[in-house]
Amino acid sequence: LLFGIFVAFNFMQQNKWEKSYRIAIGKYYKMSPDEAAKTTRFDGTCYFDEMVSPVNVGIRLSKGEKIYAVFENLSLMAYKRTGGFGFGGIFLRKKVAPAIYLRGGLGKFGLSKSLQADAVGTLYVTNKGIFYDGDKKNIKLAWDKIMRETINSDSIQLEKSNGSPVLLNGYIDPNEAAIMTLTGQLYESL
């Protein structure tokens, strides 16, 4: 019963975030909140350039680069060894004589890994790409190196053209997420 309530609550929170996210995107298409909340694909004229202004965060950028969205307190996630051992496979044991056994098989032995926070920092979205300013690690990716971004209420996943994806966990503001989505689409249309 408690598990069912927990699942229902999370589902309602996710739907609420999705609705806020669609309304935020619809604002740049000059749609009413009701119309934007029901829309799943936004087509038509986007007024992003006219409606959004760059954010000043006191960071020196390359010429012509402007910051449009800031996500604070995000954890950069990475697969790390947990210290536990993983062991599995197929093994056979055959008795040859009293107290003597013949053993053989195929197996795999290794240290187990799990997704853990590698750094905590701020993600900046610019017109030229994204950069993550973490306490232990920094990442800078140009828009042409990002194949796809997946944004949820609690994570952002950036799939790079080469290498493993970048996963950032934390609270994602739907308004900032809308700006990130539209900035990526703006780059695609150039």
PLM region spans:
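Acidic, Ser/Thr- and proline-rich intrinsically disordered linker/docking segments
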Residues: 10, 14-23, 27-28, 81, ...
